[in-house]
Amino acid sequence: MDLGIRGRRALICASSKGLGKGCAEALAGEGVDLVLNARGAESLEATAASIRSTYGVSVEAVAADITTEAGQAAVLETAGDIDILVTNAGGPPPGLWSDWGRDDFIAAFDANLLTPIALIKASLPGMMDRGWGRIVNITSVAVKAPIPVLGLSNTARSGLTGYVAGVSRQVAGSGVTINNLLPGLHDTDRLVTLDKVDAGARGISED
């Protein structure tokens, strides 16, 4: 199926593995040129090289911590005028309500709320000027059905949902759409970690 996006340019965060990598491969399969970002340079470049070889699209890789101002500046400078933005970040650690303090919530908000907002604000003006843009935020099914051990994630991602609900309506007339993806269970490193934590807390085998 041709989605009509061949030749577009996309920035995809946390794209060296997992859902971000899957999004990158899907967009590359549609002929979209990519800017990939993750913190680990080695795995990021391996993913970029694989996509270049497989799909023949332009792929630039920026290893940086996207939750920092310096990291955002580096990624956005390389990305330039993008047509598609996919925000994505690893979820905060699981735990109990009594485990989390103010610093834990601030870290969760930085990664899963404030960073996507900063990238959206940086990308929207150009998209609106050109009359076309697609922004997709990978959040979690926990936004609709909160998961008890993921209180940090539940809180931050719900905040992003509220922000996007308002902004998407404000910019829809400019040819720009903003949507959230709420993935459920996928075979990723994140799910393996959560299973280990849950099994340990319940004193049972991971199997």
Briefly describe each language-model feature range.
Residues 91-106, 129, 149-152:
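Conserved mid-core segment of classical short-chain dehydrogenase/reductases
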Residues 120, 156-157:
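Active-site helix of classical SDR
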Residues 125, 169-170:
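Alpha-helical segment proximal to the catalytic Tyr-Lys
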Residues 72, 96-98, 104-109, 135, ...:
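Substrate-binding pocket helix/loop in short-chain dehydrogenase/reductase
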Residues 30-47:
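Conserved glycine-rich Rossmann-like NAD(P)H-binding loop of the short-chain dehydrogenase/reductase
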